[in-house]
Amino acid sequence: MTRRYWHINLEEMMEAGVHFGHGTRKWNPRMAPYISAKRKGIHITNLTRTARFLSEACDLVFDAASIGKHFLIVGTKKKAADSVASAAIRARCHYVNKKWLGGMSTNWSTTETRLHKFRDLRAEQKAGKLNRLPKRDAAMLKRQLSHLQTYLGGIKYMTGLPDIVIIIDQQEEYTALRECLTLGIPTICLIDTNCDPDLADISIPANDDAIASIRLILNKLVSAICEGRSSYIRNC
């Protein structure tokens, strides 16, 4: 993996509040190497280490994107949902930003069946077929389509399991993380001071509550993915 310069600025991270952790009573002792201080009852993350692991993650996704790998971004917290969707769309990644349905990856055949149903319903709606059905049947199928759009809309073009999964909040997305571990799918995980840094392939210590912090981390990662995709297109 070639190391590159990703314009990761400590001052920019401080302005985004990346360094603010959870209260000192809500911490995981395994995070001790990533904590630099305690201040007013909260842990402060060591931003030098954050920059190091964020840079490593950017290198990884650049290399993966440059050979055509596929990414999934998972972040279902309400405050992060829009940022997850916009970042994923910008980098042409799949995303889950409403709810991780249990077995979404470990029971891929079921997910695939749901996706086929979703695509069929979308096609029927675009063709105006739903409007030609009896009102009761049309209403039922439209509700079904709305439900599928909410939970599968971000992965509607997926045809197989992702090559790398980016997880925005370890505790919130623990089910998704465990499924990735079960399947051996590499993960990049944003971890706060109450998380376990040993669960993901690359853990980025950072504030997972502040939207500015989440956006900064996401922007760096998707910029690296976009650069990698450009490299892939040039080499095709």
From Swiss-Prot:
The keyword Ribonucleoprotein applies. Keywords: Chloroplast, Plastid, Ribonucleoprotein, Ribosomal protein. GO terms for cellular component: chloroplast; mitochondrial small ribosomal subunit. It comes from the Eukaryota. One of its GO terms (biological process) is translation. PROSITE patterns: RIBOSOMAL_S2_1, RIBOSOMAL_S2_2. One of its GO terms (molecular function) is structural constituent of ribosome. Pfam families: Ribosomal_S2 (PF00318). It is found in: Plastid, Chloroplast. Belongs to the universal ribosomal protein uS2 family. This is Small ribosomal subunit protein uS2c. It comes from Calycanthus floridus var. glaucus.
